[in-house]
Amino acid sequence: MTAIRPGSVTFENVTKKFGNFTALPNLSLTVEPGTLVTLLGLSGCGKTTTLRLLAGLEHPTSGRILIGGKDVTNLPANERDVSMVFQSYALFPHMTSLENVAYGLESSGFKKNEARERAEEGLKLVGLGGMGHRLPAELSGGQQQRVAVARALVLEPQVLLLDEPLSNLDARLRRRVRTEIRELQQRLGFTAVYVTHDQDEALAVSDTIIVMKEGGIAQKGSPRDLYEAPASAFIADFMGEANVVPCEVISAENGEAVIRVAGLTHRVPARNAQPGPAQLAIRPNAVTLQPQAGGGFSGTVAHSAYLGDHIEYEIETEHGKLFIVDPAVEQSLPLQTDVSIQFKTRGLAIINQ
């Protein structure tokens, strides 16, 4: 294999219709070379349609798609400089790992010996050197996934597309393989567009996350940006659970905001806060509970569940039920206990109205 040639991706005002249904209304986005960008969202948000448009498996109703600065809008899939790792891996069960990786090369016109050499190099890249003789059935789910990645990479695409690549793995293996994918992408420096509905997966592997909703972009940013500075209540709750309550921003300067919640003032990170009515997103682990209510932000324990290293509470308040995670397992609060709710310094985000 020669050096990886990471390419950029650009969607310019792309609309995709299926009959009378508009799946993507005027979508514009960019992916910088050498980055891993995740399209994240609920089912039906448009992320898979976006990936299929990029792969050439669908064509836009209007707009332009560019890969590496080249307009590929009307090019068929086989003429685009991309490779795709499918959800099912799509390995041939009767072929060895080496033969699976070499197959695409031979189909692209490489001589058999050269294809095998490049396939062996590809398997080494993904940590499967010496395992080329094994059939897919003789490999673990994670190893099969790496064979699929190797098969895509040996074609030296400008962009690697990954469509829900971990969905067929169990939870423990998912964590390990997502780490391997991220390490491989950072080591080789290829551009990747990754589709998933799993927020933890997106947070773990991405340089940039694009959260999609109803065919548009709800928010784009780094994993930290989306988690710590959500642009809306939807993003706050989608990127890890959040309790959203009304508040008033009294002032915001020098990176700190003074807010009023339930009659009490608090100081929290300002980020992009503007004075006036707002909402406060509260992560479940961003508060402490004290077993005595005394005005201010308080509530009553409506439900509790012991989960080993933490206790989950539902606290009934004037703003509805709050979901709270408390690591203090040694002092469980009984049901109907009145509690005061105190904010920590992290895990709070102001959402402007």
Curated annotation (Swiss-Prot):
One Pfam family per UniProt: TOBE_2
Ranges annotated as spanning the membrane: none
Gene3D superfamilies (alphabetical): 2.40.50.100, P-loop containing nucleotide triphosphate hydrolases (3.40.50.300)
Compartments where found: Cell inner membrane
Family annotation (InterPro entries): AAA+_ATPase, ABC_SmlMolc_Importer, ABC_transporter-like_ATP-bd, ABC_transporter-like_CS, Mo/tungstate-bd_C_term_dom, P-loop_NTPase, Transp-assoc_OB_typ2
Domain (ABC transporter) ranges: 9-239
Protein family according to the UniProt entry: Belongs to the ABC transporter superfamily. Fe(3+) ion importer (TC 3.A.1.10) family.
Function, in words: Part of the ABC transporter complex FbpABC involved in Fe(3+) ions import. Responsible for energy coupling to the transport system.
This protein's name: Fe(3+) ions import ATP-binding protein FbpC
Organism: Brucella melitensis biotype 1 (strain ATCC 23456 / CCUG 17765 / NCTC 10094 / 16M)
Encoding gene, per UniProt annotation: fbpC
